């Protein structure tokens, strides 16, 4: 049961993320695009070429600031500790297989900040990346000398002791939300949390109010709105309120679902630009080292079919349809 005094909440960036920085253009004619990066010294590198687009196709570009992400995450670790609630991260590391493991790595580094400040170089030299989660780091400690490995273990223990409790995937086995990038997927984890009164499992195998960290604000808002409603009016009961089917736009690698080959982790500061075959700049962003930049394509036909499908399903089921 939900109560008005629940401390559960969603934390999202709201600025300097994919949603905030998005630019888009609808192509007036078929074309072939190029994605270029120009560094601060004026050197240009082609990131992607031969990008074929059709008339009416929507192309968008955006980026998430690594610096803003790190500041946001540090604040959320502090907030969860101060409020006495679980710290949890909710991403799409399976579907968004290029960007989200990197974001997950930032989350791991934020929680275990002192670990990476002290042993980050040694871990990197041993091929142990935060992007793969805490389990991969703990499993690779044999690649370090005994003294360093023991220091890493101590730093991990200290982070747990001094930081907020972390939501668990398996309390009995000590597997946290930060162990494996793909263990907690937002589409499944957030509805599950909401169904359990906004709580997740802690290390003592008890449910506890939770801070759900969803860095990109593109889809964080809907979960906060549901949480606010449940706090005010109680848990949802589908048997009395019904359901709303979701019709997503995914066909022909639409939107972010086709962004994998157009996602880049920036090595340096500069400008990323999307240009047409005439060399004209359609989209551009000023980026810094570590920023995550991506482009998406959405063809005209899938958009039309998507809306048509939603209308058809709504008529057939006599229900509301949510399109996203």
Predicted segments, located by residue:
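Conserved small/polar residues in nucleotide/adenosyl-binding loops
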Residues: 321-323
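Extended, well-ordered protein cores
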Residues: 1-105, 114-319
């Amino acid at each position: 049961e939900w109560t008005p005094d629940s401390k559960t909440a969603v934390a999202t960036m709201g600025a300097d993320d994919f949603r905030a920085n998005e630019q888009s253009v609808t192509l007036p004619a078929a074309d072939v695009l190029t994605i270029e990066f120009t560094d601060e010294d004026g050197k240009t590198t082609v990131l992607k070429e031969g990008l074929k687009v059709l008339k009416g196709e929507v192309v968008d570009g955006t980026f998430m600031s690594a610096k803003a992400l790190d500041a946001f995450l540090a604040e959320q670790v502090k907030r969860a500790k101060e409020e006495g609630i679980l710290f949890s991260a909710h991403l799409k590391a399976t579907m968004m297989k290029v960007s989200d493991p990197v974001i997950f790595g930032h989350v791991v580094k934020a929680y275990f900040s002192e670990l990476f400040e002290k042993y980050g170089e040694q871990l990197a030299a041993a091929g142990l990346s935060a992007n793969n989660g805490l389990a991969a780091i703990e499993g690779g400690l044999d690649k370090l000398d005994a003294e360093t490995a023991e220091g890493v273990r101590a730093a991990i223990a200290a982070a747990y002791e001094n930081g907020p409790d972390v939501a668990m995937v398996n309390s009995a086995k000590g597997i946290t939300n930060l162990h494996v990038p793909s263990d907690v997927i937002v589409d499944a984890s957030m509805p599950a949390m909401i169904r359990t009164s906004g709580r997740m499992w802690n290390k003592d195998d008890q449910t506890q109010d939770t801070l759900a960290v969803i860095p990109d604000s593109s889809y964080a808002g809907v979960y906060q709105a549901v949480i606010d409603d449940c706090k005010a009016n109680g848990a949802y009961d589908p048997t009395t309120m019904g359901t709303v089917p979701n019709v997503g736009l995914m066909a022909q690698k639409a939107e972010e679902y086709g962004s994998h080959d157009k996602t880049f982790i920036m090595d340096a500061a500069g400008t990323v630009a999307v240009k047409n075959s005439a060399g004209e700049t359609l989209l551009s962003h000023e980026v810094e080292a570590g920023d995550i930049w991506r482009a998406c394509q959405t063809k005209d036909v899938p958009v039309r079919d998507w809306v048509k499908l939603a209308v058809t399903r709504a008529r057939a089921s006599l229900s509301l349809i949510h399109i996203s």
